[in-house]
Amino acid sequence: MERLGRFIANHPRPLLVATLVFVALGGLVAPTVSSHLSSGGFDDPTSESALAGTRIERIFGVNDPDMVLIVEAHSGSVDDDAARRAGLALTKSLSAEHGVVRVESYWSLGGAIPLRSRDGSKALVLANLEGTQNDKHELLDELVPRYSGTNDDVRVAVTGFSEIYRQVTAQVEEDLVRAELVAIPILLILLLFVFRSPIAASLPLGVGLVAVIGTLLVLRAIAALTEVSIFALNLTTGMGLGLGIDYSLFVVSRFREELAAGAAVPDAVTTTVATAGRTVLFSAIAVAASLSALLLFPIVFLRSFAYAGIPVVAMACLGALVTLPALLAVLGHGIDKWSVRRTAPAGETGAWYRIARWVMRRPLPVAAAGTVVLLLLGAPFLGVELGLPDDRVLPPGAPGRAVTDELRRDFAGNEAAAMLVLAEGVDPASSRPQVRGFAQRLSRLDGVARVDSAAGSFIGGELFFAADVISERFAAEDATYFSVVLDPKVEAQSLEAEDVVADVRSLDAPFAFEVAGPSADLVDGKSGAFARIPVAVAWIAVVTFVTLFLLFGSILVPLKAVVLNLLSLTATFGAMVWVFQDGNLSGLLDFTPTGTIVLSNIILMFCIAFGLSMDYEVFLLSRVKEEYDATGDNELAVARGLDRTGRIVTAAAALIAIVFVAMISSGISFIKMFGLGLALAVVMDATLVRGALVPAFMKLMGPANWWAPAPLRRFHDRFGIREATAGGTRT
C-alpha cells in the first residue's frame, strides 16, 4: 500500500485524466442502462413450478396472462348487444396486434360465466404477449394507452402481471430521480458540517458519483450477457453514494490529520494510502464478500444485486484509493481553503473517549443491557411470514393496483393468478374418467373457487360447465392441464395460497403431475431459498472471520464481530416485521401491509447490512490495533481508537443512512423497507454496537482480544496483512 501511495503522490495528474475519461464514457452509457434491465426475476427458474410453467407454455401456449382487461358496460349487462359487439371487436382487434400470441374473452369463449363479474356489468379479456419481459413492456407501452379508456359502449381498464411489472419499473425510475434529488443536497450540507470546508466536503460526494457512474457502465455490460433486475439501480445509487462517501471520509480525515501533524503533502498522501487506504481496501473486501453470497441464489432479483453490489464496492474503493489521493496530492493544503474552522486533532478528552471509558468501567451491565435491547427489538422476527411481491407493492393510487383491486372485488375467482396443474404422459381422451375425477377432487379443496379441465369445469366437486370445444384447450396429444382458480379471498402470494398448493400436491392421482403458477412459485421459491440460506450465511461468516484474522491476528475479535453483527441484524429484521408485516406504520409510510415480508428483501438486507457492519468494524478495530501496538494497553487502545474513529464513523453512518432514508420516498413498498431497514441497521451498528457493545466486550476480553493459538499465530506472522507508514514502522 505504501508503494501505491508513493506512486499516486508522484503521478496524480495522469490518474485524474484517466478518471475523467472513464467518467465521460460512463456518462454516455448511464442513461441507457435502465432500458436493458428487467422488472421480474423474483422466482426460482430451477424450481418445479417454473419448469412446469415453461412446459405448459411450450405444449399449450398458456401462461399467466400478461394483460387482463376489465370491460364494463356503461349500462345494463355485458350480454347486451352493444357491450357484446364492443367486447368481440376488442378481442378481435387485440388478437391482430403484433406480439400478441393468445387472446381469450368472455365473449369469444361463448359467455364463459367465470369471466363475468358477479353483477354481470363487467367481463374479462385475457391476453398473452411474446418475448422477454422487456419486449412485453415495450408492447404494453403501445397497447395500454390504445385499449384502455372509455368509448360509447364500454369502459376498459388494464392490469395483469406484465402490466403490473411495467408500472413497477416506471415507478422505480421515477423514485430514483426523486431519491437523488432529496439525498444529494442533504449529503453536501452534512459533509460541509463534518469537514468545515467546501472543497473537502465536495471530494467524498464526487467519489460517490464516480462510483455510481462506473457501476452503471459495468451493469450495462453484464446486462448484455444475462438478465439483470432493474431494482439493482437502487443499490447502485444507494451504495455508490454511501460507500464512496464512507470510504472518502476516512481517507480525507487521515490526510488532514497527517497535514496537521506537519507532514509534507507527498508524505501525507503516502501515509494516508498506507493506513486509511489499507483499512478501506479490507473493508471493501468484507462488503464485497457479503454481497457475493447473493450469487448462491438462483433468483435473478438477488443475483442482480450482486452484479451491481460487487462492482459498486470495487468502484467506491478504487475511487477512494486512487482518484481521491490523486486529488489530495494536487490540492495539498488547498483542501482547507475557505475552511470555516480547522478541526483539532483528536485527543483524550473527546466525547467518544469519555463514552468508551464510561462503558469500560461497567462492561458487564452495558453488554447485558445492550444485548437485551437488541433481542427485544428482534423478537417480532420470530413471527415473520415470508412472501413474494404482487400488485400491492404499488401505491394505492397506481392504475394497475386500482384495477387489480377491482378484479378482486367484483369477480368470483382470481383468473389472473390461477394455479396450473400439468399431467404429462396422459391421453385426455382415453383417460377422461381419471381426468374428471381428479378435477372434481381439486375443486373440493378449501380456497379453490373453480377448476377448468379437459373434462369440463367444476365447482365444489360438481360439474359447472360440461366439456365442449373450449375444453379442448386443456388437452394435447400426451398431456393435459388443469386450471385451478383460487377464491378471490385467497391472495396468490399468501399463506392461504401456500396451503392450497400443499393440498394440491398431496392429492392422490392416477397419474404424475406438477404444479405451476404464482402460488407454487412462492412455495418453491421459499423452499429453494431456505436450502441455500445456511450456505450463504456460512460463506459470509467464514470470509469475514478469515479477513479479520488476516488483519488482526486474533480469534476472538472476528468471532465477536460476527456474533454482534448477527445480533444487530436480528434487531433490524424484528423492527421490519413490526413495521411492514404488521403494518404499524403503514399510514405514516403510505404502504399497504400484506401480512408478509418479501423473502428476497430479507436475504438481500442481510447480505448488505452484514457487509456494511463489517465496514465500520474494520475502521474501528484498525485504529484500536494501531493504538494497542503502540501502547500495549488494551483499555487505552479501545478508548483512543473509538475517539479517533467515533466522530467519522458516526458521520459516515449518518451520511449513508441519509442515502437509504431517501428511498423511503419510493412508491414501491419493498423499496421503502429496503431503505428504512438498511438505514436502521447502519445507525444502530454505528451507535449502539460500536459505541457500547464493542468497547464493553473488548474490555471483558482484555488482552485475549489479540490472542490466537500458536499455529495460527505463526500463520498470521507469515501471511497476515501488515501496513507500514511512510517511515516504515508497522502500525
Language model feature labels by segment:
Residues P12-R13, G40-D44, V78:
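A short N-terminal beta->alpha junction/helix N-cap motif
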Residues V21, V68-L69, A369-V372, M419-L422:
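Short coil/turn segments at secondary-structure boundaries
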Residues V33, D66-M67, V71:
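Short, conserved active-site loops that position catalytic residues or coordinate cofactors/metal ions
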Residues I70-V71, L126, S253:
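Short beta-strand segments
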Residues S38-F42, S49, G238:
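Disorder-to-helix initiation segments
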